[in-house]
Amino acid sequence: MGVPAFFRWLSRKYPSIIVHCVEEKGKECNGVRIPVDTTKPNPNEVEFDNLYLDMNGIIHPCTHPEDKPAPKNEDEMMVAIFEYIDRLFNIVRPRRVLYMAIDGVAPRAKMNQQRSRRFRASKEGVELVEEKSRVREEVIQKGGYLPPEEIKERFDSNCITPGTEFMDNLAQCLRYYVAERLTNDPGWKNIVVFLSDASVPGEGEHKIMDFIRRQRGQPNHDPNTHHCLCGADADLIMLGLATHEPNFTIIREEFKPNKPRPCGLCGQTGHEIKACQGMPREKQGQHDEFANTMPAAEQEFIFIRLCVLREYLARELTMASLPFPFDFERSVDDWVFMCFFVGNDFLPHLPSLEIREGAIDRLVGIYKDVVHKTGGYLTQNGYVNLERVEMIMQAVGVAEDNIFKKRKDDDENFKRRNKEKRKRMKAQQQGPAYLTTGQFAPHALGRRDRPEAVQNARHQACDMRMQSNMNAAQSLKAMMKNGGNSSAGPSDGADSRGVKRKADDSDSEPEPEDNVRLWEEGWKQRYYKNKFDVDATDEDFRRKVVQSYVEGLCWVLRYYYQGCASWKWYFPFHYAPFASDFKDIKDMFSDFEKNTKPFKPLEQLMGVFPAASGNFLPPTWRNLMSSPDSPIIDFYPDDFAIDLNGKKYAWQGVALLPFVDERRLRAALADVYPDLTSEEKRRNSLGSDVLFLGKSHPLFDFIHELYRTESNEGTEIPAELCHGIQGRLNLDDDPILPDNTVRSPVPMLRDVSQNTAIGVKFKDPPYPDGFVFKAVLLPGAKIPSKVLKPEDWVRGNGQPWRPQLGFNPNRQQAHLDQSGFRALGYVHIYIFNIINVKTSKKKKKKVEHSCFPEFPVKVVQTFCIFTFTSVRQIRTAVRVGSLFLAFMLQGSSCSSVQRQARYSPVLLIFPSHS
């Protein structure tokens, strides 16, 4: 969902919803990899029934990762995707269902955002190439050093769109992967696997929600099914709440801000391309022996417990003395609806509502104030009561003027504080050019800050040595420039791997021009004139914008609770109206057009692709994007404006692209449809979901019999054979059958010669037109035990926050007291000294452990290694004066001191007294 910072706001406001995943790792014995046994109980101390994968959130980081080298070719990409799924399966360990959903053709309402994102990606790619070429030339002219430019084909991530050859190949690879795992992995033997590839219309997460909704409506559904959905989009939280399932958990990668990214020219971290000076790479180790050996920190996962979020919301939304009965489930639906106003994938957010300014808290406060007047809830089962919504919007509209003025004041205060900070930094630079660093650096009296945790011994030791070398070199250089004096002003020879600009340079960045000036009188007139090019007195136009936005609110809520109400509807403007414009909206919406159909895959490609990605389309189709004689050439501008809309960065702005006219697009494509090959026609057709299972599953014999009798009629699934799951089965056109070899589409992987899996087409159970899925707790649903404690309601109560590991709040977790943390502060120095010992040519001892890569150590003395799992033992041991080193056995890449406490056991190394 297009709500920047939504998850950050949510996790800060409701911190107990987050649980860190416990992940068992496979082992290696004599060069043989031993995988994790996923048949064993889940180490997170919870058992999940169904795991749903929003596959696009997996495909993108596996094909073009940001924090490690990209795969060399498509085969490596497929293997990376398989490994990612394996890792998630290992953490979650579903016992009934694995559902993999790839984005298919999206509703027209989503295509606006998809089009903007793909045009931006193409534009940024061209600008990046130009910038790299320009900066490279400048650096070389100044005598800088840059590694030779690699000539390699750039991976166009736009190919991750339905209808491309890449997505078709991915579907084939996933079919192979599922067959291989069902045949060879014991943890898969009793689960049903659903694959909804890119040929099936719908966004991945909404195909998953549609599956859950339709299964909930069946009489055999288990109301206490424990769902786990994988995905990083913020809208998954709202979608999970909208199911009203009591046991719903989301798993996602843990977001770590400010992760270093290598420069695209020199490959070093700490600066961007525009600031590259072509400095030679420093040696990693005395003889560069550590170059290319530093392992990248593995991405960690977290759980988001929606049952705990429901606890928070129950406390926040409960209202007394209402003129109608309080219904918590209805209030949750209203909360989800109010979140739409701060942004989503289908509508721009209202100008006065910014998530970073506490917009949701403001809306909830207004909601609770006016609910006595509204006489009821805002929504019911995905349908909106517009008369009540208008009262909320009018209350927001009254405050709009103050909101805009406060926003301006906050911005000015922020700039003022930054300016003062830069002045302080400049004053500090006037001090001595050489200061003692490390353990002998001066510290303020009484400072009790805990030291950083050791993340990777070898890596950090190298960093320490490089930093101390650089400090010494800079100090010497400054003293020489200053004629031997020990103090000097700021030097131009600052470290090129740090901040590349002087502190004052940021003042020279031009402020984006804001012609609207929402904080000044006349803001509404200027807004409509600048954004819509109409006079603010044009009431008919403003009403048209509001009506479209109201339709959008109704469409989005229906999409979340009932499915796609219209494949054709979309919001036809780049900007939203003001809250104060929502007047007399009760009769602005009646219903959507019935029986609309989605685009076909190649048609959607024509609607969302820029001309630069035309190579993924048939030749005559791509000519429509570039030929001057094309009747739709105006859909594909080579360049386009980006309106910052009051923001600072281009990625936050609004891409001013022309909207695609569906009628004109279809008319132009009618002339080139006959040019499609049979393969292109197949890729342009709509497909269906496929169900897979292994030989030991109770449903296996039933499906095998369908193939034996060649039954072409749809057959209902016997619910008793499949955990209550219902739907219709049809024979697959290219089936995976037992005893048939499944060929590997990836050359580096082996064929499945003794396949025991079987696959069949699957269709969700149908419902009559006009059927309404009830947004309620199902009969028999058991509410999970409450998790929150009284202290969890007090924010900033002074207690140290410790993240929970796994679902058991009473899990034994080792932690260190203050003396232990002080000892950890000297780990860097200790390892630094070990690694820098000049080893003789005699026999060297290798110290190996899973926490850190092996490195040579001169045997100075013998060490005794003790492993403790008792908190009491650790506290005692940490106080022992002979402690040399303490660090975590597991999760050594943890990034903050607070994270240390969640890992056990702890490794303590003492010098032996023998």
Q: What is each residue range found by the language model?
A:
Residues 1-827:
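Noncatalytic, typically N-terminal accessory segments of nucleic acid-processing enzymes
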Residues 54, 844, 854, 874, ...:
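Low-complexity, intrinsically disordered segments with a bias for serine/threonine
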Residues 828-830, 849, 861, 873, ...:
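Low-complexity, intrinsically disordered or signal/transmembrane-proximal segments
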Residues 839, 862, 867-869, 876-877, ...:
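Ala/Thr-enriched low-complexity intrinsically disordered regions
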Residues 879, 902, 908-911:
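Compositionally biased, intrinsically disordered low-complexity segments enriched in Pro/Arg/Gln/His
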